A protein has these predicted regions:
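Short, small-residue-biased leader/transition segments that mark boundaries at the very start
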Residues: 2-7
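The feature captures the beta-strand-to-loop junction immediately N-terminal to the Walker
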Residues: 74-76
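Conserved ABC ATPase "signature" region
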Residues: 104, 150-168, 216-219
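Conserved ABC ATPase signature
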Residues: 172-176, 180
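Conserved catalytic motifs of ABC-family nucleotide-binding domains
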Residues: 193
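Catalytic Walker B motif of ABC-type/P-loop ATPase nucleotide-binding domains
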Residues: 197-201
Length: 286
């Protein structure tokens, strides 16, 4: 089902019932989907608030991501970035505020319905089917799209070639390296032709030598006019490929701007990056 594709239950302690409700998948990744508007789309949040009892963990957070750009969502532990990210994904319901895809209010949409509107989600934890081959992992998503069989076959071969999975296409999910697994997960997510992809800790569990490979893949998604929202504790790896970034601190947005602007801001360096931080952009971006 859809929840097994680009969706994973993060098992958030305070939101078990919300997650269960949000992961109630419908019959198809395309059935009942809202029509996508032509041109550049914008995914945005307006004044999101999340409270647990008397404690406010996110206070009036507004962010936006346009198609064809990579946006980082950063912050120290306890800053509210993960909660803000999960509200945008649809795993957590905000107490206040709204989430829009262009002018469509998707605040109450469960994750599977957001996928139908063109929002893909790649969880931090491994989401490949461990006992299925790489090609079957991808094909299982294509089968849910209601596309013609010939299209599904062509799309499968295209994704396997693009993500250099030819040598491991028959390997089961539990036989893949961290980098191979990530490439398979991204390829599978692209099977539904998303307009946006939410990346949760994409560099976690990946060997250092494979990190740049994943960065290049994410960067090239811009060529598909896909908007990317990344949240990751690996600040250098994230800022090195983002167009813009938001820094959350104590539940609020402390700063937003380009990676260069963040790296040069005195308050950001004092509270988060440290004075020794040096931004290193990737050569493949030039």
């Amino acid at each position: 089902r859809q929840r097994q594709m680009c969706i994973r239950d993060r098992g958030i302690k305070d939101n078990v019932e919300e997650v269960k409700e949000n992961l109630q998948a419908g019959p198809s990744l395309t059935a009942g989907a809202e029509p996508r508007e032509e041109g550049s789309m914008v995914l945005r949040t307006e004044d999101l608030v999340k409270k647990y009892g008397k404690r406010t963990v996110v206070s009036h957070v507004s962010i936006d991501v346009k198609q064809g750009e990579i946006v980082g969502l950063l912050g120290p532990n306890g800053a509210g970035k993960t909660t803000s990210f999960y509200m945008t994904v649809g795993l957590i319901t905000p107490n206040e505020g709204r989430i829009f895809l262009n002018d469509l209010d998707i605040t109450k949409y469960p994750v599977y319905k957001r996928a139908q509107t063109g929002i893909g989600y790649l969880a931090q934890e491994a989401s490949v089917f461990r006992q299925m081959s790489v090609e079957d992992n991808i094909a299982s998503v294509l089968e849910m799209t209601d596309k013609p069989l010939e299209y599904q076959k062509d799309k499968l071969e295209s994704l396997i070639a693009e993500f250099r999975l030819q040598k491991v296409r028959k390997n089961k999910g539990n036989q893949l390296s961290g980098g191979e697994r990530r490439r398979t997960e991204i390829a599978r997510c692209l099977a539904i032709d998303p307009k946006f992809i939410m990346l949760d800790e994409p560099f976690a569990g990946v060997d250092p030598i494979a990190v740049e490979d994943i960065q290049q893949i994410v960067w090239k998604l811009k060529d598909r006019n896909i908007g990317i929202l990344i949240t990751d504790h690996n600040v250098q790896e994230t800022l090195s490929i983002t167009d813009r970034a938001y820094l959350l601190f104590e539940g609020k947005i402390l700063f937003q701007g380009t990676p260069e602007e963040l790296a040069e801001n005195k308050i950001v360096r004092e509270k988060y990056l440290s004075n020794s931080f040096v931004l290193r952009r990737k050569d493949f971006m030039k």
